[in-house]
Amino acid sequence: METTTPPRPGLREMKKRRTHDELLRAAVHLFTSQGYERTTVDEIAEAVDVSQRTFFRYFAGKEEAALALEGITVGRFVEGVRARPAHEAPMEALRQAVLEGWNSLSEAIESIASVELYMRMYRVIESTPVLLAAHLRRSAETEEAIARVLAEREGLDMDADPRPRLAVAVFGAVMRVTERQWITGEDYSLEEMRELTSRHLDQVGPALLGGWRAGT
């Protein structure tokens, strides 16, 4: 079977991508160093030596720029779930999509910001009410999109069968706990993230069905 190599982007597309990434990098640096509310669009544009008008060609506003790194991770994860082998059970597909997707995701993120800067941006989102509200809205939309992917994989009517939404809700809760533990720890390595993810997913069954007291 022949494989085709995707065409390389043209110079125009490469320049647009470079400008987008430079604006995003500048925005993240400013948000994490002086705060989201204190940072203006003009400051972000000036840091890259472009006009405010150019900024708005790439982002609808500060909020979109602040959540852009998160958007990259979410988009990659949804596509990762969609690409999992059909024989995998739903929870296993979710598990493998996140565990196997971290390498390529890390490369995409680190081309813009270091893992440490990414973690700092995550803290800014959690501590800024307007960003946290937007983050929660996006999280709900993402869970719905992933549940729909699972329903399609399993041939289910998502409106009649609650299992896709239940599975994604449980998985999402595990990932939120994992991310919070990761960003508050001292080890920002991918191996630590994988280890935490695997450990917490392994604990879902016992946590839901077993007793928690010592000796039970």
Indicate where each model-derived feature is located.
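Basic, helix-initiating cap at the start of DNA-binding domains
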Residues: 1-34, 38-50, 67
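C-terminal peripheral helix-coil segments that are non-catalytic and often amphipathic
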Residues: 1-4, 148, 152, 180-216
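Hydrophobic/aromatic residues within well-ordered alpha-helical segments
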Residues: 19, 73, 98, 138-142, ...
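Short amphipathic alpha-helical segment with a characteristic S/N-K-E followed by hydrophobic residues
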Residues: 23, 61-66, 76-77
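Short hydrophobic/aromatic patch on the recognition helix
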Residues: 51-59
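Hydrophobic alpha-helical connector segments
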Residues: 68, 75-121
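Hydrophobic/aromatic-rich alpha-helical bundle segments in the mid-to-C-terminal region
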Residues: 136, 156-201
